[in-house]
Regions:
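Short amphipathic alpha-helical interaction segments
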Residues: 60-68, 132-141, 201-207
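Non-catalytic regulatory appendages
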Residues: 214-270
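Short, leucine-enriched amphipathic alpha-helices that occur as contiguous helical runs
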Residues: 107-115, 171-178, 315
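A short, conserved structural fragment
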Residues: 70-80, 145-153, 213-220
């Protein structure tokens, strides 16, 4: 890697990721904003995770927003369930098509058999597995051909349907997938891209090398990494502070991290173990740009485990965020429970705080409130125009989900 051009602080990295991830100011409703919210895909491996990720980024989100005609569901990075923009289907499918001949032929052959068997029908993946005499979980290996879409709502088996293959060169799709990753998760490395995308490290490194002329090396507290050169100015300016509170669902892109990137987001190793568990991850509580705890939901009950004592204002903001969840299965309002007592005298001096024993409070489900947003701007993409926001950064002194669903 070339000599880094800029030393980035932790605050700069997190502020940039929050800004490009639309976690500082919610976007206005509409397909353009949905595509931007899903710029690196929305993992939907837990029921309604993608919906709550959209809610954290787009105002006016409704219970059926995840099923908007502009969005589709597929097996994407790491063969996990993802919601992506229909016009970006090639990026998240063909962008992961294996490079080696044997693996690619296996994917193409399975996809051809699947398409022929479906013959225009939509069927459960169990039915398709029995029809093709393969384990249903193997069907996801056909997804990188771009010809397979799924529909999964959490309660039943996913259904599968075949669609025409996108008219995009897989190499171009792979390059765009790297660009998406570096824009949302940057600064990042080829190896971290490989881990996120679920492809071989050697293939990831080759793709990054192909983009080297459009990348800039940066030094971060966890090591040297790449950013898109076009993103460099955004790292040098002070972004507006993060909105008061966001409740990010299990697997949300903001903390869908591995290795040292987790250390950057959550420096305390004990807290990292609470967020990135060995089983289903809880959701992350984001307040003023910092992860301050975890949350889980069961029906109307949202249980919040804070990592230190919070101010009355922070608590109110978190409860209001929970109350606005656009969930179809909540009748009579969300009930928030604060789990345990947290914070030390040293932590309590950071801001006016209150002591929190385990308490619960029922909040009417008012649905998503409208939050002021700014206008949208356009950016270029080799495959399709990239929607990004024209949220002019302003000066700020701030640095920058049983499952939770």
């Amino acid at each position: 890697m070339a000599r880094p051009r800029l030393d980035l602080t932790r605050a700069q990295v997190l502020a940039f990721r929050q800004h490009v991830g639309a976690l500082d100011v919610r976007l206005p409703p509409g397909p353009h904003s949905l595509r931007q919210a899903a710029w690196a895909g929305l993992q939907d491996s837990m029921p309604r995770a993608a919906l709550l990720s959209i809610h954290a980024r787009v105002e006016g989100t409704k219970p059926d927003t995840w099923a908007d005609p502009s969005l589709v569901q597929l097996w994407g990075p790491r063969f996990s369930t993802y919601v992506v923009a229909e016009q970006d289907r090639a990026v998240f499918s063909l962008g992961r098509l294996p490079d080696d001949g044997d693996s690619r032929r296996a994917a193409e052959d399975l996809a051809a058999r699947l398409v022929a068997f479906l013959d225009g029908r939509t069927m459960t993946y169990g039915e398709v597995g029995r029809g093709l005499v393969v384990h249903p979980n193997q069907l996801r290996y056909a997804a990188p051909t771009g010809t397979v879409l799924i529909r999964w709502e959490g309660a039943r088996q996913p259904t599968i349907r075949a669609v025409p293959r996108p008219m995009v060169d897989p190499r171009d799709a792979r390059l765009e997938l790297v660009r998406r990753y570096l824009h949302v998760f940057g600064p990042a490395t080829a190896d971290s891209f490989a881990s996120w995308a679920g492809i071989r490290p050697a293939h990831a490194r080759a793709t990054v090398d192909a983009l080297i002329e459009s990348l800039t090396p940066m030094r971060t507290p966890i090591g040297d990494a790449w950013i898109l050169t076009e993103d460099e100015p955004a790292f040098r300016i002070a972004h507006s502070g993060a909105t008061a509170a966001r409740l990010l669902p299990s697997g949300d892109a903001y903390y869908l991290l591995q290795g040292s990137d987790r250390e950057l987001l959550v420096p305390d190793p004990g807290r990292r173990a609470e967020l990135w568990t060995s089983r289903v991850w809880p959701g992350a509580v984001l307040v003023d740009g910092e992860v301050v705890g975890t949350w889980r939901r069961a029906g109307p009950d949202v249980v919040i485990q804070a990592w230190h004592r919070l101010s009355a204002g922070d608590r109110a903001a978190i409860e209001a965020e929970a109350a606005s969840f656009p969930l179809p299965d909540v009748q009579g309002g969300i009930r928030v429970r604060w789990d345990g007592r947290h914070g030390s005298a040293r932590q309590a001096t950071k801001r006016p705080e209150i002591d929190r024993a385990a308490t619960s409070r029922t909040i009417p489900n008012r649905g998503p409130g409208r939050i002021p947003t700014n206008s949208a701007r356009k950016s270029s993409s080799p495959i399709a125009a990239a929607p990004t926001t024209d949220r002019k950064p302003g000066p700020s002194s701030r640095s920058p989900a049983a499952g939770c669903l």
